Amino acid sequence: MTDNNQNNENHENSSENSKADEMRAGAFERFTNRKKRFRENAQKNAEYSNHEASSHHKKEHRPNKKPNNHHKQKHAKTRNYAQEELDSNKVEGVTEILHVNERGTLGFHKELKKGVEANNKIQVEHLNPHYKMNLNSKASVKITPLGGLGEIGGNMMVIETPKSAIVIDAGMSFPKEGLFGVDILIPDFSYLHQIKDKIAGIIITHAHEDHIGATPYLFKELQFPLYGTPLSLGLIGSKFDEHGLKKYRSYFKIVEKRCPISVGEFIIEWIHITHSIIDSSALAIQTKAGTIIHTGDFKIDHTPVDNLPTDLYRLAHYGEKGVMLLLSDSTNSHKSGTTPSESTIAPAFDTLFKEAQGRVIMSTFSSNIHRVYQAIQYGIKYNRKIAVIGRSMEKNLDIARELGYIHLPYQSFIEANEVAKYPDNEILIVTTGSQGETMSALYRMATDEHRHISIKPNDLVIISAKAIPGNEASVSAVLNFLIKKEAKVAYQEFDNIHVSGHAAQEEQKLMLRLIKPKFFLPVHGEYNHVARHKQTAISCGVPEKNIYLMEDGDQVEVGPAFIKKVGTIKSGKSYVDNQSNLSIDTSIVQQREEVASAGVFVATIFVNKNKQALLESSQFSSLGLVGFKDEKPLIKEIQGGLEVLLKSSNAEILNNPKKLEDHTRNFIRKALFKKFRKYPAIICHAHSF
């Protein structure tokens, strides 16, 4: 740089600095003059107040003296000038202190108290924006849960007006032990058949099985427009393909978040929420009665894997406008504090993958795509080839990749039959089976039933999931198989390899404070979960009388001025064999329960009508009643009793095979109950000659 250029630049900088100094000096002078004028005016006000007090004192002693109009006019001008100056400097939300010289601090505190009252009013209005609702409105909505209350899973809810209805989610749940041959449970759709003519659509919050698992079974009976985000519809579409329902994809409606749409008489907006599956949503449902917020399943994750946190701004937007009713996830209502972020799992995965000497086998929910994604990233980091095994895991991962939710290099993946070609320390297997399902890939690996993979002593098996209530025994069984194979198992002793997808108490409080509902219906969970969520809501200022604890089948009506139970409808579960995708009749399940708990007795009798006696060809057998050595005495005892029964039977019974069967069955049933104090299943065939 030349000297001239340097001088020019210095001159320019000097000029700019001078201008800046002049501006600052001017601003300071204006501020000083303004402050001086304000102080002078305040002093004039004080002088005026003192003069007024003095004049008043003199008037009391000289009542006949005429008032000095000259002084009044002079000081009125002074006071008006001061007021004009105050008005010119007044800012909205700011009150100036006027009574600075009143005796003691009385005047000063008066002004401060006005400020306190103003702020209290603002706070009350802010905490209760639902006061803006029209309490004279006759409009109301009716809420009917068909699943998801009094249980974990199976979520389904109807929101309706006299002319229109929407169904929120259609989920499945797992059976408890004792429902033999039943793989999944789905809600009873009877009520939907009753109101089918006014159902405007099915609204999906997210793609977990407990929210979408019943959709194909519903569409086999009833079809409605199905609204959801791309991942939800992608996974539902895959289910429809498995059930031969591909033609019903024409009912799918892809929605965009933050874009309200009309569905029947409702205006619905999907709001982004964080959960243990990507593309989850809360719902803002605007009705004539008021706004309803349904959180869906949620947690408030500030550092999610995809860097897309909960849309708190949009939730707060509706909270400020005024929300009539909040329906919120209660699953983790007993858990204090906050639920850790999904991203907190990364360090534990890093350590486990780094230290693993053999194959790494990671099992989790197939829908937890971010969990799978993180595991695959660490597999790639430590130069492992990835084999994805398990139909649902492969399907979900493929859909997420095709839709662009995750990006992974295809060259890192291999097929299950290629695993044996690589050294063990270069393999990551991502698989299903975290719930101990007997048909899952992990279970079959652990029991040597898988076609390509068996567990080895040097394997590290990471089960990155918590057992769903009802699945504890199944998970324990697969753990036992793995440990017998001498595999290293990382499960619940590693607290940081699994985090919940549901909000704990502090997140529930934040949701309540953001939404500030007038009425509250805690949802998603057993009764103890919603009851605990109720207490959290009360602590956040929701009046107890404005909270109702629902159970499946309850019908609650909500309007701007009231919430009340108005009825109960038939609800329950339908049983499904997941291998055949067919429903199982309730009577079949009951028969299986009888057989399992009390055993079976089989009687095939041949009767001589004339002699009223059993023929020698009659056969008897039992299963699950007595041991083999005790069966003959039992049969002999039953035969003897039947001989006596037949002798006293009339011709009408003996000549009618159906009546003879019923007569025989009732006798055997009573005899066995008398002996064993239980009612086994009885199979009876009767023939008379």
UniProtKB/Swiss-Prot annotation:
Q: Residues that bind Zn(2+) 2, according to the entry?
A: 210-211, 297, 524
Stretches for region Disordered: 1-88
Question: Where is coiled-coil annotated?
Answer: none
Q: Which GO terms describe its cellular component?
A: cytoplasm
Question: Principal place where this protein is found?
Answer: cytoplasm
Question: By its UniProt entry, which Pfam families does this protein fall under?
Answer: Lactamase_B, RMMBL, RNase_J_b_CASP, RNase_J_C
Skewed-composition ranges (Basic residues): 56-78
**Residues reported to bind substrate:** 498-502
Basic and acidic residues composition bias: which ranges?
Answer: 9-24
Q: Which cofactor does it need?
A: Zn(2+)
Which keywords are on file for this protein?
Acetylation, Cytoplasm, Endonuclease, Exonuclease, Hydrolase, Metal-binding, Nuclease, RNA-binding, rRNA processing, Zinc
Activity regulation details: Catalytic activity is regulated by the balance between homodimers and homotetramers, with homotetramers being the active forms of this enzyme. Acetylation allosterically regulates the homooligomerization state and hence the catalytic activity.
The EC number of this protein is 3.1.-.-
PTM field? Acetylated on nine lysine residues. Some of the residues are acetylated by multiple different mechanisms. RimL is partially responsible for the acetylation of Lys-321, Lys-395 and Lys-647. HPB8_1270 homolog is partially responsible for the acetylation of Lys-321, Lys-395, Lys-509 and Lys-647. Acetyl-phosphate-mediated non-enzymatic acetylation pathway takes part in the acetylation of Lys-132, Lys-321, Lys-395, Lys-509 and Lys-647. Acetylation of the remaining residues Lys-138, Lys-335, Lys-545 and Lys-632 occurs by a yet undetermined mechanism.
Disulfide bonding pattern of the chain? none
SUPFAM superfamilies according to UniProt: Metallo-hydrolase/oxidoreductase
The note describing how and how many cofactors are bound reads: Binds up to 2 Zn(2+) ions per subunit. It is not clear if Zn(2+) or Mg(2+) is physiologically important.
The GO biological-process annotations, alphabetized, read as:
protein homotetramerization; rRNA processing
Specify the enzyme's EC class, one word: hydrolase
Residues with the N6-acetyllysine modification:
132, 138, 321, 335, 395, 509, 545, 632, 647
CDD domains reported in the protein's UniProt record: RNaseJ_MBL-fold
Q: Which GO terms describe its molecular function?
A: 5'-3' RNA exonuclease activity; protein homodimerization activity; RNA binding; RNA endonuclease activity; zinc ion binding
The written remark on domains in the entry is: The first 132 residues are not conserved outside of Helicobacter. Important for protein stability. The C-terminal domain is required for homooligomerization.
Under HAMAP family, the record lists: RNase_J_bact
Its protein name is: Ribonuclease J
Q: Its encoding gene is what?
A: rnj
